[in-house]
Amino acid sequence: MGIVLRQSFKNVVATYLGFAIGALNTLFLFTYFLSKAQYGLVSYVTSTATILSPLIAFGVSNTWVRYYSAYTDRQEQGKLNLMLCLLPLLVILPATLLGSMAYEQITQWLSAKNAEVRPYVWLIFLTAVAMAYFEIAYAWMRVQLKTVFGNFLKEVFHRVGMMLLLVAVYFDVIDFHQLMWGVFWVYALRMFLMFISAFYVRRPTFAWGLPQGKKEVFLYSLFVILSGSVASVLMDIDKFMLNQYLPISEIAVYNVAIFTATVIAIPYRSMYQIVSPLTAQFMNQQKPQELANLYKRSTVNTYFVSMVICVLIVVNAQQCYALLPDKDYSTGLWVLIIISVVKLSDALVGFSNAVLLNSPYYRTVLFLGVFLVIGAVLMNRWLIPLYGINGAGVATLIAFSSYNLLKSVFVYRKYGLQPFYKETLQTTLFGLLAIGCFFFWDFPFHPLVNIGLKSLLVAGMSVFFLLKYKVSEELVRLISKFRN
């Protein structure tokens, strides 16, 4: 657990730095320097690229994590590396050809409700390619158990780049069109830096030919396309579909709420980067006891930290909206609360995903994910016209809750692993009590002062609860070291 905690802590620091910069961008620079329509357009392009990137990556990032430790022969590893580097071309080349042939039809469909999208359709595809190859290089770092710099690039680099672009727009160094292309170049530079780092840490060997078990590797990659797409589609399909039904400015309101709630997932995302390859190792080496211990401790630690963050966000939400220049952004309050529940459920059951993707049962779960994506699309089509952005939030909640519940049931039936321990129940009760105590009132001061005072009270309550009930041995030891 030592390497998990060390790298997870560093990843959490880098991720929170990224989200701090992202918060500055999302809550202030975007809202002050761009119109809501411009902000919505940036969000739409990046969200659609995020949906496409797992398809373009052809599942390679997860496949590398799943199979790298299973190949011990250097020659076979070289063949595996070559195969996985070339697989994305099976999507990129046909997609480029199809996009060239059907460009007019695609642009008409995407810009039917909002004509502003039309000039940036190709930009969506190029950004998706840069995102996909970044994840492939990052997967190589993860199988070497070196996740910190990659996580820094993943969470911090592009947000710093976006901040610089927004400042450049504000001072009229570039115009909005140049900013849109600048977004692509930020992601492209991030991809190149990731490849340089990956080769520096350990240069991959390549050997001509296909590895043993090539059919299994190929089929796993094929199915993981669906898995990666499921997570991306479930999280970003709402923004994509909002463009089809509502003014693009509504995406800006929705994005502020989504980004704020996403902070809850930081501990899970950071720990997952190192837990996933360790899970693959324990499963390949058939060490069920070590796997069960890793699963429980990771779940308990992550869920408690995520719950504290969730409480802080929900009880301070109204004061945060009071700081924004356009009061229309506050219409996203219920979206923020709904998506906070989604992110909290991810923190609770998310490590089941690492078990499933590294198990022989991944096909069943991926097919399940496809049906859930279809359900999410249908629910968004039904709820967005009726309830606007709140309908999109409810559709996301239903889809993710169903997906997480079914994954947890499957893991429990096959491996006897489940996230519902005494510690997670205690943490849930703590979260409900804290929100009940602090959500319905505010101090009569400036919003920043109110946020600071409430946060101090919540932090004190959290530390008291942790020390009294000892829901996490690692966190208790960490606090004890800090006190000493």
What spans do the regions from the language model cover?
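Interhelical loop/hinge segments that connect adjacent transmembrane helices in multipass membrane
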Residues: 1-4, 116, 172, 176-183, ...
